[in-house]
From Swiss-Prot:
Expressed by the venom gland. This is Dermonecrotic toxin LarSicTox-alphaI-1. The lineage of its organism: Eukaryota, Metazoa, Ecdysozoa, Arthropoda, Chelicerata. It comes from Loxosceles arizonica. It is found in: Secreted. Its EC number is 4.6.1.-. Dermonecrotic toxins cleave the phosphodiester linkage between the phosphate and headgroup of certain phospholipids (sphingolipid and lysolipid substrates), forming an alcohol (often choline) and a cyclic phosphate. This toxin acts on sphingomyelin (SM). It may also act on ceramide phosphoethanolamine (CPE), lysophosphatidylcholine (LPC) and lysophosphatidylethanolamine (LPE), but not on lysophosphatidylserine (LPS), and lysophosphatidylglycerol (LPG). It acts by transphosphatidylation, releasing exclusively cyclic phosphate products as second products. Pfam families: GDPD_2. GO terms for cellular component: extracellular region.
Length: 161
């Protein structure tokens, strides 16, 4: 049994709880399924400084399968929070010594915020209105550069067009 096509992202809101990752890994190993870690990704969702996130991953022994989330509730996302942290995460993902594999931004419900997130280079968007994202992806500025993820995509590989 290879675990099928199911993937899981352990999304942890507090850096101090990095031991959840090591405990999860140890439990799979002790149950005789260490290979299932190939299906597990990691995310610290507490909006901490990217450098501090990296330190927590090092403590947990994480060397890959890192999704970095950034975001806030949709009602204040763009005009209070901005995309500075997401841009830092994208820069880390794109650097030769970065630890991030994917960057996703949430919660994006407006056309303008969707465009801003895509322009920042995020890999994914969480939304309450998928039609908004689909419509933006069909615009000439985005249709050659981005696409909707498919069943066959590897969630740990950065999509390059």
């Amino acid at each position: 049994n290879n675990g099928g096509r199911a993937y899981i992202v352990l999304s942890i809101p507090n850096l101090a709880h990095y031991q959840l990752i090591t405990g999860f890994k140890e439990t799979l190993k002790n149950k005789g399924h260490p290979e299932l870690m190939d299906k597990v990704g990691h995310d610290f969702s507490g909006n901490d400084n990217i450098d501090q996130v990296e330190k927590a991953y090092k403590k947990a022994g994480v060397t890959g399968h890192v999704w970095q989330s950034d975001g806030i509730t949709n009602c204040i996302a763009s005009f209070i929070r901005g995309l500075d942290r997401a841009k830092k995460a994208v820069a880390n993902r794109d650097s030769s010594n970065g630890f991030i594999n994917k960057v996703y931004y949430w919660t994006v419900d407006k056309y303008a915020t969707t465009r801003e997130a895509l322009d920042a280079g995020v890999d994914g968007i969480m939304t309450n209105y998928p039609d908004v994202v689909a419509n933006v992806l069909s615009e000439s500025a985005y249709k050659a550069k981005f696409r909707i993820a498919t069943y066959d995509d590897n969630p740990w590989e950065t999509f390059k067009n």
